């Protein structure tokens, strides 16, 4: 029976059958047409459709439908067709207005089409088109648009616009109520704070932009070097960049002071990677005798149009004044992108892109303006308050009998009750958010934490899904070599000394053979038995494997010079290579780990430049290899290779290493590679397959000519180059399989356990292979070892996805492991169903995920579940995911600071996530919920008093309190105690960490909901009525006594309500209470205009105020006591 349950439960079997009959009738009634000879869709159905399995969406559909088929579209796209009057009234008008405005803006600011260009060296005047200025501008406004822009940003929100209209209405004599400053002072304070904050931020941006744009660079001209500002650099200029200087624009690398014709650059501010990148100068210009000779040649660079991809470039360098003309292909290794830093030597480049066309600017996207769920909920409540305001005003006018100009009375009542919507709500919440951020950064238990987005700290307390990267986030990104497998023998960490012995034996025999052949000595004696032959065979294989690992990489040893200059340079062959200050630079930690391992077993990389590398054997002999070609690693090919020539033997060898999925079809047939890759992956090791192929001189010469020709192609260069390289990647000899371990970070297991107990579902999104990702998920206890795991089989069609989803549907409480390719197919056809099933899993592991897929998964969870998501990562490939999530957390790791800088919160260790969420996230949400509701209570209670007062006095639209009383009530009299609620806590941080189940209650939003809001409304109505009626009943003769009694009781009631709300007292809370009370008592002496000073000093005044205050507050204290006794909250059991 389980097989017959449809995955999409809304459609019953009868409904499906009815739909089948309707569609069959439709197709049969359509009659023959142009496609009559084509079989129907029912005839195209897979045989699998006749299984007992019910289909996921439409049982009558064939699996192999056209992509444009309506029924295969995601539901999010289908629902867009349902637009009508209801859609327009409920918000569709906003969408239409926004679309029209965007259309007009696009028409007015039409982007210039980007084109390829020809750039002549040192001749910017030859540029055929005008290019953007090379200036950086991060400012949002200029001197003319600052005030209008800031005001627009404030008043585009309904509430701020409402307060502006209310304040402006006081200029109309017929609508004026009290003093102008009663309304303009709070609004002016909010605007002044906002304008000052924006002005400071804008001035800082201006200073940063000015500093960058004013940096001086040396520009090479016919007359020599001249100093030029960065903002004045043009396309075609020859710019000289010194060591440790930022590259001002995108350039082609022409010359360097380094003898090797290459230099290192740091790209951490561009791609987030901390490893240095090797860049190569154009050989034609590097060979010129002098720097000034650049103007004696007639040369140009052809560059492709500006693009986003920072890892690719296609262009050509042409020198026309030589015979024949020189043509060199240009690739990414010949470029110097803006915002990178020269790490060695001095470089000269020709500018090809400036300003907005540089790679760094084009990849700088404006992240979405994140709005917290609490802010959205408060916005809904304020809309409800506005409706209550309008309803109350209409009721008052109705009871008044619409006498006289009723519309004027209606507007005056709207003004009188305007305090229902407190203008101080936004100010208090913003100040509270700033306080939460300060507390987070001051927490000694999570040192180094930085709050970069101060507007969403409450989001940390409402998370349901946590999406995390693996490498560098759950793991340390510190690679340690653990395993070498040769097929018949495997070496681990405890047997590395055997590899060292094999290397010593191999190189000793090589030296003896070389010495014996040169001296024409007697031939070597044969081995006495077969055992030595086996040992020599193993030694030879180990030697070949280690040598391949030591040669096939992109690692460069760098030595810090001890001289006065203190510059970093590559060691030469005649240097002392035993220097302790040697470091390895590479594009990946895996590469460094492999080279460090070969050094540990005796084969050391001591030198490398563009054309050669040198190895030192265990016996101290230096081996020199000429680098003929290098094929760097790409995410598409998943492998890298190098062709080298042994200088001593003239042998040419092609070495290659890569992922098993890429290398399996390249190496010769074997029966152990797939099995051992799986075994290593289950141990949590990152595997690489190493292979080689010997080449003859003729073979290499033929390859080189075809390779160089392909590199000069202007169209489809990448494909043509890949095709030529693939011609070599055939029947390669499998040498070994390496295993590198990426160790888990400290306290990852207890942190994940804590998050799981808090009700947070954790998804791991990684670009690593399936086996490794699964192993890390189990070793980190993301997936418990006793928990079932469903590995989603690779699917490529809709039918396969259908069957696999049905197989997954029958499993319960199991973790899901799926690859990025299979995920893409499932989302194409069954987006809603897949997300619905995946969200039911306790854990999900997505492997082989691209950065865009990571961000897409985050958006899918937001769209289909409506729950709050958090993304955490440490690399540049996690930035899109972090920015797409409701709350982004970046870890400062070995892959750089790009993720950290793009995140809302930055931490140094994954284990800090636990305290960040359980303590600070939980406290921030509960504090802001209490603060927001209390501020609304403060406005509701005084509006209730105004309503009672107006009702008693024949519905007159006369204010109860005027002038400074209203301003003081919203500020000095109650602001400090109310704001002190940001220090409140229901449980101690240690208890919140010990019992993460407390966090689970927050996801239900019970601390701030319409239920709690209605409770506060009832409290406000009760207290406002008691205060006003009590004052009216107890006053004797003068009306001013009513104001004195009611207002004093109101202030005391607010202070007592804060005390009632507080759960854990802080000394600053006591100070705030006493300070506010002291300010009010002291101000009584100066409020002769509002109070009778002689009356407020009498005992009668004191007992009347005390009686009214007790009646308004005592029942609430009793109710709170009874609730704690009869139905205590979960946290009270722990705090007691």
Curated annotation (Swiss-Prot):
Membrane topology, as annotated: Multi-pass membrane protein
Subcellular location field: Golgi apparatus, trans-Golgi network membrane
UniProt: Mg(2+) binding residues: 469, 471, 874, 878
Residue intervals annotated with topology Cytoplasmic: 1-145, 196-383, 430-939, 984-1012, 1063-1066, 1120-1136
Transmembrane segments: 146-166, 175-195, 384-404, 409-429, 940-960, 963-983, 1013-1033, 1042-1062, 1067-1087, 1099-1119
Signal peptide: none
Entry EC no(s): 7.6.2.1
Protein's GO biological process: endocytosis; phospholipid translocation; retrograde vesicle-mediated transport, Golgi to endoplasmic reticulum
Gene Ontology MF terms in the entry: ATP binding; ATP hydrolysis activity; ATPase-coupled intramembrane lipid transporter activity; magnesium ion binding
One Pfam family from the record: PhoLip_ATPase_N
Protein name: Probable phospholipid-transporting ATPase IIB
